[in-house]
From Swiss-Prot:
Complex and partners: Self associates. Interacts with tcf7l1-A, leading to repression of tcf7l1-A target genes. Interacts with ctnnd1, and this interaction may inhibit DNA-binding. Interacts with ncor1.
Domain BTB, residue spans: 32-94
Record's keyword terms, sorted: Developmental protein, DNA-binding, Metal-binding, Nucleus, Repeat, Repressor, Transcription, Transcription regulation, Wnt signaling pathway, Zinc, Zinc-finger
PROSITE patterns recorded: BTB, ZINC_FINGER_C2H2_1, ZINC_FINGER_C2H2_2
Molecular function GO labels: beta-catenin binding; DNA-binding transcription factor activity, RNA polymerase II-specific; methyl-CpG binding; RNA polymerase II cis-regulatory region sequence-specific DNA binding; sequence-specific DNA binding; transcription cis-regulatory region binding; zinc ion binding
Biased composition (Low complexity): 259-273
Annotated Polar residues bias: 245-258, 278-311, 652-664
Pfam families for the chain: BTB (PF00651)
Zinc fingers (C2H2-type), renumbered ranges: 501-523, 529-551, 557-580
Protein's job: Transcriptional regulator with bimodal DNA-binding specificity. Binds to methylated CpG dinucleotides in the consensus sequence 5'-CGCG-3' and also binds to the non-methylated consensus sequence 5'-CTGCNA-3'. May recruit the N-CoR repressor complex to promote histone deacetylation and the formation of repressive chromatin structures in target gene promoters. Contributes to the repression of target genes of the Wnt signaling pathway and to the methylation-dependent repression of zygotic transcription prior to the mid-blastula transition (MBT). Also required for gastrulation movements.
Protein's name according to its UniProt entry: Transcriptional regulator Kaiso
Region called Disordered, residue ranges: 128-158, 181-311, 644-664
């Protein structure tokens, strides 16, 4: 049978070209489906791009609409973050903005910007300690990423991090490409570019922050072990290590057994006896699944660790790698001394074995870590897990690794911690403090996801629009609040039997749903209320009503003392204070608000005296004149010139848009007002018993 060859091709420049194309679309405003408002500045972006790079937007966009307003980030800072998201670079940022940039990156859940201060502090330590011992202050992190195939010093690819301990005056060289050699591997954590490439490889939407505090006593030992990674050529285990490629850096996933029993059975015979305390060490998998890391602490005890592998590739000899840095280290730790961080793929770890179906599982160490909150599948939270093995004496002696994990150890720790609940179709994370909820009861710690001190968010998922109130999945938890979502503009929060409609943008609560709908037009900019007399459109009906008063000249505010009417409250209040010497804001009711009559104003012509025959017009205010001698209706052209019309002669054609009325026709208001959008208004004042017209010049709204 003829064999066929399978060809695989990879475009290495595709990711960069795609990112540049998306950035060009954002700059041109093409296909942007979300608007982020920061300090009166609007940023157009793509929803999927922001959610892929920021955990905050990933959670927010599940409930937010097309317009999002952020009040905890500065506009110039957010512009830099947005440029990084679309270009993967931070270019020419001022030093005084760096601290605010890192803070905003933590709030928005952008891992690279959030961790930017760590490599910068380590670079300072390396440069400052150049005269001492060549980079002692920079803690090595050999377990953060498995080394790529070892390259010689004349490798054609430029090295991202190149810090040699024996050269005291050499500064780190950071370039755009990524490669590591055995000499550079020991100090690669000191560069921010490695974090940048790591972010490109395992950038995930849902992340959790985990950190391990390494004591200062362990840093020199780890640095010394990292320096011993160079292996003589006659070592037969070197080819096994060189098989670690970016596509499969650790053979653990392919060779480990799928069940816990088989893993424990195979590893019990090959696991050596180690001196506690020890930590498990697993190299980072570049796939965007769950990843984790811990630094080994048993190396300083003088006992070599062997790579545990359960299949044909035998890297299990305890004496085969006396000085080589192991790729994967396991230790026989008692199960009750491990608090496991388990990914969503239900990977289970034991003290003597490991069975990962698709991703790695990390035992955290000798002392169990009880997280403050227990998260479940579908709920993400920013959380920093601190280990009590030692306190760092220097700012660079701790490591942060981004991993998509679900923290948890047992049901007992879940009962002790603050309850977290999964509701049918909803993901709920309660706030830590009730003080952030204003206007509601203390038991209602649900909403408010836009704020500097807010790290949790309520995520209701719209699955069934006709479904009623949600039900709790877990038993034994107090039903303090219920929540449902039928629309994308508000939450429906039920507290103590009362329903609150909460705006998803500004978190204002309303008792009436129609009031919230009118309010949300301010955020969505859906101007649904056009003016009846001009082209302006308003988001709220009350805004339109205040504006239309200037067109109609209607006086709705009436003084009860003298009966005078006024156009607005301010004029009426001034009248009451000056004329009647009374306080309109007192207990007694001194005015009345009449209902709006919505007078339809038309463009009017002139009524003048037939004996006079001419009305002088300056082109500014058109004055209708009614006299006893007779009634004549002239017309006006665009230049403000009035043409007299003799009532005994046929009517002459007027300028375009204007029509003259016959003098024999009885005069009424419909003859005076002619349809045209004119801004000059008047109001007939009948309070003084005469036919005097008072003119109101429209005010700009």
């Amino acid at each position: 049978m003829e064999t066929k060859k399978l060809i695989t091709a990879t475009d290495t420049q595709y990711s960069g070209i795609l990112l540049n194309a998306l950035n060009d679309q954002r700059i041109q405003g093409l296909y942007c489906d979300v608007t982020v408002i920061v300090e009166d500045r609007k940023f157009r972006a793509h929803r999927n791009i922001l959610s892929a790079c920021s955990t905050y937007f990933h959670q927010l966009f599940s409930v937010a609409g097309q317009v999002v307003e952020l009040n905890f980030v500065k506009a110039d800072i957010f512009a830099e973050i947005l440029n990084y998201i679309y270009s993967s670079k931070i270019v020419r940022v001022r030093c005084d903005m760096l601290e605010e940039l890192i803070k905003s990156g933590k709030l928005l859940g952008v891992p690279f910007i959030a961790e930017l201060g760590i490599p910068l502090s380590q670079v300072k330590s390396i440069s400052g300690a150049g005269g001492k011992d060549g980079g002692t202050d920079a803690p090595s992190n050999p377990d953060h990423k498995a080394p790529e195939p070892q390259k010689s010093s004349d490798s054609p690819l430029p090295c991202t991090v190149k810090i040699k301990a024996d050269v005291k005056t050499e500064m780190p060289v950071i370039t755009e490409s990524f490669s590591l050699s055995s000499d550079d591997y020991k100090d690669k954590k000191a560069s921010g570019s490695q974090d940048h490439n790591s972010e490109k490889e395992d950038d995930d939407d849902d992340v959790i922050f985990c950190s391990e505090i390494v004591s200062s006593k362990q840093a020199p030992a780890e640095r010394k072990e990292a320096a011993q990674t160079q292996i003589p050529p006659d070592n037969e285990q070197v080819p096994e290590v060189k098989k670690v490629t970016p596509s499969s850096q650790v053979q653990l996933t392919q060779n480990s057994l799928p069940t816990n029993q088989q893993s424990s059975k195979n590893t019990s015979s090959t696991t050596q006896k180690f001196t506690p305390p020890v930590n498990a060490n697993i190299s980072k998998n570049p796939t965007p699944a769950a990843n984790g890391f811990l630094s080994p602490t048993a190396q300083k005890q003088g006992t070599p660790n062997a790579v545990q592998n359960q299949h044909s590739q035998n890297i299990t000899s305890g004496n085969a790698l006396p000085q080589q840095k192991p790729v994967v280290n396991f230790s026989s730790i008692k199960p009750q001394q491990i608090s496991a961080i388990k990914p969503k793929t239900e990977v289970i770890i034991h003290g003597n074995g490991l069975s990962p179906p698709s991703s790695s599982v990390i035992p955290l160490g000798q002392q169990p870590v009880t997280p403050k909150h227990i998260s479940f599948d579908g709920v993400q939270k920013k959380q920093v897990v601190t280990f009590t093995q030692g306190s760092p004496s220097k700012p660079g002696e701790f490591k942060i690794k981004i991993a998509d994990v679900v923290s948890g150890s047992s049901l007992d720790s879940f009962k002790d911690s603050e309850p977290r609940r999964i509701i049918d179709g909803k993901k709920i994370i309660t706030l830590d403090t009730a003080s952030e909820i204003e206007g509601l009861s203390t038991g209602c710690k649900v909403y408010a996801n836009i704020g500097e001190d807010t790290y949790d968010i309520v995520i209701p998922i719209k699955e069934d629009p006709e479904e009623g109130e949600a039900k709790l999945d877990l038993d034994g938890l107090p039903n303090r609040k219920r929540m449902k979502l039928k629309h994308d503009d508000h939450y429906e929060l039920i507290v103590d039997g009362r329903v609150y409609y909460i705006c998803i943008v500004c978190k204002r609560s309303y008792v009436c749903l129609t009031s919230l709908r009118r309010h949300f037009n301010v955020h969505s900019w859906e101007k649904k209320y056009p003016c009846r007399y001009c082209e302006r459109v308003f988001p709220l009906a009350e805004y339109r009503t205040k504006h239309e008063i200037h067109h109609t000249g209607e006086r709705r505010y009436q003084c009860l003392t003298c009966g005078s009417s006024f156009i607005n409250y301010q004029v009426m209040a001034s009248h009451i204070r000056s004329v009647h010497s009374l306080d309109p804001s007192g207990d007694s009711k001194l005015y009345r608000l009449n209902p709006c009559k919505t007078l339809q104003i038309r463009q009017y012509a002139y009524v003048n005296n037939s004996t006079n025959g001419t009305v002088i017009n300056d082109g500014a205010i058109n004055v209708p004149v009614i006299t006893d001698g007779g009634i004549n209706v002239p017309v006006i052209n665009d230049g403000g010139i009035v043409y007299d019309i003799d009532p005994d002669e046929p009517q002459q054609p007027a300028s375009e848009g204007n029509h003259a009325n016959s003098a024999t026709k009885p005069v009424n208001w419909d003859n005076i007002f002619i349809q045209q959008s004119n801004q000059n208004m008047f109001k007939l004042n009948t309070s003084e018993g005469g036919t005097e017209f008072e003119f109101v010049i429209p005010e700009s709204y």
